[in-house]
Each structure stands twice: as structure tokens, then as C-alpha cells.
Swiss-Prot record:
The organism of origin for this protein: Prochlorococcus marinus (strain NATL2A)
EC number, as in UniProt: 4.1.99.17
UniProt protein name: Phosphomethylpyrimidine synthase
Cofactor requirement: [4Fe-4S] cluster
Reaction it catalyzes: 5-amino-1-(5-phospho-beta-D-ribosyl)imidazole + S-adenosyl-L-methionine = 4-amino-2-methyl-5-(phosphooxymethyl)pyrimidine + CO + 5'-deoxyadenosine + formate + L-methionine + 3 H(+)
């Protein structure tokens, strides 16, 4: 789809959506996004130029269907997949990709750390994906030196970052905000550093006693990104890994640096979103969202969860969806899903489905609460179908039609019950919605209340057979 769109851009020094927007040019990607989001094209251009919206769209990701992440667009959901040294293979990851797209993921991150050829699995995923693909390049940087921190140098990081851009990665998590002076602030935490990328860089800085190379070479990374229109997802290496550590000095010190880096990237006309926590008590979620907006000049916020309790292993998709819905309501632009396997193991395809549906619910709830135009239309349509006992339409309008039908059919599988005015919860005699109270009945009742008062009412026969 995008071949003709990007043909004239290749070879230029800056092909980012922000660069074109700041020149007053509306790209084909902006037009596509405007149509998908039901927004004026001019507004999309203005939001991208300002940095409040990103359109992750690497010029080498040809089958991409462009989408937007930002406060002016609907709340988005990211799904994570990826092979590890202990589990999975390419076919399994492609199966997860298909499920993620089927159940509505807006973006997808390949977090593979080993067990497969990392370049091969990434290329396969990008070629098969219509949604933006993100990566964490420090994983492969470490893998390229066989896990040896001592052998890992600054150029290794930049080499892998550019390789990912060349392959068509749309956004990369760059852990440039973690500074060597932040590391002592971790003392006193219960869980310390829980970011894999942050952990790698912390070890590198402690071994070499040098500043974070992703920070010192940040302008070089910007030069790479703008040639491919790769978007920064600035990683939060010091995100809290438990409620105790939330909103602490370490987290907020890094956030301040992330804000500075956001503005540095914008000077290069490179798109930026900023990652956030993590594990956060419910009463601190609004503070975290507002603080990010303040420090990062309203760059789109992209949060992992946050989980609102630490005691839900096996159910962390539920705990985190609660926090995600709140974060979305307060203005977070994209929610990174959590699966039931979080903290326990590598998710399988069914875990991907469970996590994604939980987060589609959270994102949709946030859109409804923020009164986005048309956000509640589907809810109202399903409610009308429910009132009319149109079971097939209810299934069709559900976020997970297969699950809705499965649960209905467990007790009433015969086709005749698809027209029944009850389900197995209430049965035919106790469902309040099949009580035939009509508008005419209510009008008659209201007339009597207005003329006589409630104490003097005479019986009104309902339009219902007894």
C-alpha cells in the first residue's frame, strides 16, 4: 500500500512525519490516520508537528496500515510477543501476531531475546504485520556479544539500532534516560531495577564506569531515526516494579531526563512517545500521568499497566487493566498489555488473547470516560440488541465474539435459543428485560401520578399476558 507513498522520500536526510508536518505538508499517512480516527487532516498534521501525536511508520514497513498514538486520537493498545532462550519459535510468534491483530492490537512489540535467529524472526514479523512493530535493540546488542557486558561497546548499540531501522521497525524503545548518577537512587527499593533494557545498561555503566552510551550518543540515534522515520519510545529503565517503589526519587529523576531527551529529539524533527510505569497504587496514577505530561511537554504517554496490586500472579492482566483504564482516562495515549503469565513465564497464544481483550476493555472504557466522539456507539448498539434479545448481534458486537457465543452456548446450545427472550441465568420467567412494560404503560402511570399523586393511584393493566 505504501510503496508509492514513500518512493520519493527514500534517500532524503529526514523523512519523519514530524518533519513533513512542521513544513505544513499533509502526508498520505496523515490522511489515512485522519480517516481512521474521524479527525480533520489539518488537526492530525498540527498534533504531529506539535509532538502530541505520533504516527509510527518506518519507510521500509511497506504493508503497514498507519495509525496514530496521541491525546487527540483513541486510546491504543500494544501487545508484546517474542521468543526467549527457553521457549518459543518463529511459527509460535507468528501465531501470536495473528491473534494480536485479530483481537485488535494497535501496535506490537517483538521482545525476542534468544532461542531463534533474532533478525529472521523480526523480519518475518514485520513482513506479516499490518500494524506498527516496536523493538528493544539493547537485547540484540547484548546477544551480539554473547551476553558479555565487558565486550559491549557504544558502536554495538548504534549498529543494532540502525539494523532495526533498515528492517522496517516502526518504533524502538531507547533507554537513554537512565544516567549513571541515577543508579544510587535505586538503593532502598524492594525490587530494584525491573526493566530488562535498564538492567543491561546499569550493568554496562557499573562495569565501565562511563555514562549511558544511549544518552551520550542520543543525537547520533536521532540522525539514524530521521532517515527511516523510526519513532522513539523512550524507555523508563527505573519504572517501579512494585507498589512500594512507585513515584520514588529514582523514577522521577529519570522522567525529568526523558523530558529533556524528548525536546532534543524534536529539534531533529523525530517523533517521540514516552514509556511509563509499571506498578502504581490507584491513588498515584493521576499524579504519574500529569507529571509525565508536564515533564515531557505532552508527548504521548505509553504505560505498562500499571498494576494496582502486587498479589495477583496469574491474574495480573486484571490488576493491570484496572490501572490501565484509569491511566487512559487521565490522558495516557497507549496502554501496553499485560498477560496472565506476567511475572510467571512466557505467554502462549491464549495468554495473548486474554491480555489483549482485558486491555481493549480498558482502552475503550477510557475513551468512553473521555467522551470521545462515537466512543459509546457500539455499547449502545449492543445494549439495544440485548434488550431485543438479538443474541447473534450481541455476539457480533462483543470485543470477543467467540467467547461470548461460547459462554452462551454452554447451557443453551440449540439454535432455537438464539431467539429466546432469556438466558440460563434468569430463565424464561424471571428476566426483567422481557417484562412487557411499554412506553404507553409508563405514560399512563405518569399521567395518574401528575393528576392524583402516588398515594391515590388506580391499577393500570400492563400490556402483558399473565
Amino acid at each position: 500500500m505504501r510503496n508509492s507513498w514513500v518512493a520519493s522520500r527514500k534517500g532524503k536526510t529526514n523523512v519523519s512525519q514530524m518533519h513533513f508536518a512542521r513544513k505544513g505538508e499533509i502526508t498520505e499517512e496523515m490522511r489515512y490516520v485522519a480517516k481512521r480516527e474521524n479527525l480533520p487532516e489539518s488537526l492530525v498534521m498540527e498534533e504531529v508537528a506539535r509532538g502530541r501525536m505520533v504516527i509510527p511508520a518506518n519507510i521500509n514497513h511497506m504493508n503497514l496500515e498507519p495509525m496514530a498514538i496521541g491525546i487527540a486520537s483513541t486510546c491504543k493498545v500494544n501487545a508484546n510477543i517474542g521468543a526467549s532462550p527457553n521457549a518459543s519459535d518463529i511459527s509460535e510468534e507468528l501465531k501470536k501476531l495473528d491473534l494480536a491483530v485479530k483481537y485488535g492490537a494497535d501496535t506490537l512489540m517483538d521482545l525476542s531475546t534468544g532461542g531463534v535467529n533474532l533478525d529472521e524472526v523480526r523480519t518475518e514479523i514485520i513482513n506479516a504485520s499490518p500494524i506498527p512493530i516496536g523493538t528493544v535493540p539493547v537485547y540484540q546488542a547484548l546477544e551480539s556479544v554473547h551476553g558479555s557486558i565487558s565486550r559491549l561497546n557504544e558502536d554495538d548499540f548504534l549498529h543494532i539500532i540502525e539494523k532495526h531501522c533498515q528492517q522496517g521497525v516502526d518504533y524502538q524503545t531507547i533507554h537513554a534516560g537512565l544516567l549513571i548518577e541515577h543508579l544510587p537512587k535505586v538503593k532502598g527499593r524492594i525490587t530494584g531495577i525491573v526493566s530488562r533494557g535498564g538492567g543491561i545498561l546499569a550493568q554496562w555503566m557499573l562495569y565501565h564506569y562511563k555514562q549511558n552510551p544511549l544518552f551520550t550518543r542520543f543525537d547520533d540515534i536521532c540522525e539514524i531515526f530521521k532517515r527511516y522515520d523510526c519513532t522513539f519510545s523512550l524507555g523508563d529503565s527505573l519504572r517501579p516494579g512494585c507498589l512500594h517503589d512507585a513515584s520514588d526519587e529514582a523514577q522521577l529523576a529519570e522522567l525529568k531526563t526523558l523530558g529533556e531527551l524528548t525536546r532534543r529529539a524534536w529539534k531533529h524533527d523525530v517523533q517521540v512517545m514516552v514509556e511509563g510505569p509499571g506498578h502504581v497504587p490507584m491513588d498515584q496514577i493521576e499524579f504519574n500521568v500529569r507529571k509525565q505530561m508536564e515533564e515531557c511537554s505532552e508527548a504521548p504517554f505509553y504505560v505498562l499497566g500499571p498494576l494496582v496490586t502486587d498479589i495477583s500472579p496469574g491474574y495480573d492482566h486484571i490488576s493491570s487493566a484496572i490501572g490501565a483504564a484509569m491511566a487512559g482516562w487521565y490522558g495516557t495515549a497507549m496502554l501496553c498489555y499485560v498477560t496472565p503469565k506476567e511475572h510467571l513465564g512466557l505467554p502462549n497464544p491464549e495468554d495473548v488473547r486474554e491480555g489483549l481483550i482485558a486491555y481493549k476493555i480498558a482502552a475503550h472504557a477510557a475513551d468512553v470516560a473521555r467522551h470521545r466522539s462515537g466512543a459509546r456507539d457500539r455499547d449502545d448498539e449492543l445494549s439495544k440488541a440485548r434488550k431485543e434479545f438479538d443474541w447473534n448481534k450481541q455476539f457480533e458486537l462483543s470485543l470477543d465474539p467467540e467467547r461470548a457465543k461460547q459462554y452462551h452456548d454452554e447451557t443453551l446450545p440449540e439454535e432455537i435459543f438464539k431467539k429466546a427472550e432469556f438466558c440460563s441465568m434468569c430463565g424464561p420467567n424471571h428476566c426483567p428485560m422481557n417484562t412487557k412494560i411499554t412506553d404507553e404503560d409508563l405514560d399512563k402511570l405518569n399521567d395518574q401520578i401528575q393528576s392524583k399523586g402516588a398515594a391515590e393511584l388506580t391499577p393500570v393493566k400492563l400490556n402483558k399476558e399473565n
